[in-house]
C-alpha cells in the first residue's frame, strides 16, 4: 500500500521530482503511463476507455480505477494473453498462479460445454449430488499419496476452502470434547485467502489493515525466509532448528491444549515465493505432532505440478491431516476449491454429524457439476502428459536462466524458487537490510518495462513474482528470460538515475 500511495504522489509530481529523461520515458511509454501517471491513456481504435469503470476492483487502489484505464485482457492462447488492442503478452504468472494448462486447452472447454448441455447445475445438499462431484472426489483421494486421505469437500475457491478448514478443525475438536483447542498458527508473510478468516490466517499486514483483522484466535510464527532472517553464520539447518524452537515456544506459551492447527504453504507464494529452508518441514512437523496439533497443507499454488512434483507435499515430505486445493485444480477454467481430510479427521466428523443429525456446512456451489467436470479433465491431462515430469525437465532452464542475472546486478538481493515458480527481490547493495525508498517504485518500474516488452509479471512492492503456465515451452522460457533481462537493464539505469538525483 505504501508503494501504491507513493506512486500516486510520484504521478502527480513527475515534472518536479524527476529528471527530464525519466519524464520523457514516462510520457513516451503507454505502459509506464498506466502505472506511474494519472494521465489518460492515448486514444485507441476500436476500443472504449474504461477509466472510472463501475467495478470495485480487487487489490486495486481507488485512484487507479478512477484515474487510469485498466489493462483489459480480451483473449488467451497457450502461454500468452492479448489485450483489447491486440497486443500480445507472455503471461509469466499464469493469471494468478492458476492457468496451469494455458489459455485455450480445448479439452477443458469441451468438458465444460458437454456438462453444461447435460446438467448445468445441481447441488450436493441432503444426500443429493451429481456424478462429476462424486468422480472428482474419488480421483483426488487416489491422486494425493503423501498421506492417506479419506474424504473430499468442495468449495468455490481457496479462500472459502481455508475458511472451511477452520470450521472443520473446530468441529473436530468439539466432537473430541476439546472445545478449548481452537487457535490457529500460521506464518508471517503467508497467504491463505482474503475472506474474513482466510485473511486472518494470512500473514500479510495489508490484508488486516482497516478490516479489524486478524481474528483473535489466529497467531503468526516466523516466516521461514533464510536470506532475509538468518543470523550471521547460521546455516539453513540451524535456521530451521531455531524456527521450530520458536514455534514450540509459542505453543507452550499459549498452551498446547488451545492450539488446534498449524497451516503452511509448501512454498510461500504471494508473500514473495519463499521455498522452505533445509529440514524446515521435518522439524516443524515433529513439533506439531508432539502437541497433537493438526497440520494443514495449503496446496492452492503448489499442487498439480508447479514444483515438479504432483503436490508440494511430495517434494517436502509433508504428511498433512488436511489439504487445501484450488487454482490449477481446474486450470482456473472454472472456479473450484477442495479440501482433503485424513481418515482420522473424516471419521470424527462423520461420527459427530451422525449424532447431531446433520453436518451443517456447505455452499450452493459445493461440487458444482461444471467445475467438477472441468477439474476431472484437467487432472486427466496432468497425468496423461506427465506435467510434473515436464516441469522438472524445463525448470532448470527457467530457474538458471533468471537466476543468472542476480550475480551481476547491483539491485537484485535474491532470486529464489523451484520448479516453475520464482521470485526476485530488489534491494540496494544486495542487502536484505537496505530496501529502496518506497516512493522510487523500483518493482513497479520493472513490471512496467516487462509489460512494454510484452510480458506480464506480478509486482509485490520491490518483489517480482513469476509462475508461468506449466505447459510453457523451452522457447517461451527463453523469451521470458530475454524480456526479464531487458527490463532489468532499464531498471538498473533508472535506479542509477534516482540515486544520482537523491544525492543532489
Swiss-Prot record:
Optimum pH is 9.0 in the forward reaction. It is an enzyme of class 2 (transferase). Changing residue 98 to Y: In her1-1; loss of E2-hexenal responses. Residues 1-18 form a transit peptide. Changing residue 312 to D: In pop2-7; loss of activity. Transaminase that degrades gamma-amino butyric acid (GABA) and uses pyruvate or glyoxylate as amino-group acceptor, but not 2-oxoglutarate. The pyruvate-dependent activity is reversible while the glyoxylate-dependent activity is irreversible. Cannot use beta-alanine, ornithine, acetylornithine, serine, glycine, asparagine, glutamine, glutamate, valine, leucine, isoleucine, methionine, phenylalanine, histidine, lysine, arginine, aspartate, threonine, tyrosine, tryptophan, proline, or cysteine as amino donors. This is Gamma-aminobutyrate transaminase POP2, mitochondrial.
